[in-house]
Amino acid sequence: MYDSEFEDITAEELKQFIKSHNEKEYLVVDVRQPDEYTKGHIPGAKFIPLNELLSDFSGLPANRDVIFYCHSGGRSLAAASMFSEEGITEKTIYNLKGGILSWEGRTLKGFPKIQVFDKTKMPVELLLTAMDLEKGAWRFYTYIMDNFEVDPILPTLEQLSKAEITHAKTIYRFWEKASSTPMTFDQLYESLKGEILEGGESLATALAYLENIEKNPCLRILELAIHMEYTAFDLYKTMAEQEKDRTIQNSFLTIAQAEKSHMRMLVRSLDQCV
């Protein structure tokens, strides 16, 4: 087993990478849905839908660099993360930033960008960041359920929205002990803005564009949700690494595992977007 991580790669970097490497040295993997792949894909890419990929990584090589891509980067982020955790390869794993849109020289105008957290913050600050992210996730799922026709994936969204509040309460117990001026959970949760997006942009405003962006906003919603759950997963792993108390560390790892399960739930729902 190898201790593997993954790296982001831009479209221009990937094009140069392909020009400078032998085909036997790398594999490009398209993790989108079948109808997306047939409409256009990176030449030579191996097609493995994300749901199928996460069920069995055995089709990927251990002796070649692997580059994952999707529509705009959310699903491939999950693919790269989970493949790296398998420890199958000693080679480099890449995630194509911006997905096939960036490859084609396009961008998804207005697509919400998940806020990146500062890993150098003190533990008590990371705890607040984590609770804010959980509230943001809850706001995201609630907004989607209230404003979009998402019947095929509604049970998944309902389950996830409830889980976000449960996670926030779990984190609160640790924050309460670490804070010099603790308040009740309800007071703190109410005070949190739940801003999971860069620049403090309104979540409702940022997501409203999804209604008209494509014929199938379901995929775009799930892709953003997968990206959001990955961010939470990464945050909890970081907090676990920084925490010296074994009990708290294990709790963060448990929540990180739950966030990974959320990613898998969302991936399984991709086939419902027809």
Identify the residue ranges that each predicted region occupies:
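Flexible, polar/low-complexity N-terminal or interdomain linker segments that lie immediately upstream
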Residues: 1-27, 31-39, 108
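Short amphipathic alpha-helix with an adjacent loop that forms part of the alpha/beta core around
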Residues: 16-20, 55-62
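Catalytic cysteine-centered active loop of the rhodanese-like fold, especially the PTP/DSP P-loop
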Residues: 57-102
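Active-site-adjacent scaffolding segments
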Residues: 94-100, 104-121
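Carboxylate-rich helix-loop segments that flank metal/cofactor sites and access channels
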Residues: 109-112, 179-216
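A structural feature that tracks compact, well-ordered secondary-structure segments
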Residues: 126-146, 156-161, 170-172, 221-241, ...
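Long, non-catalytic architectural segments outside compact domain cores
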Residues: 146, 152, 162-163, 168-177, ...
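Short loop-to-helix capping motifs
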Residues: 150-151, 245-246
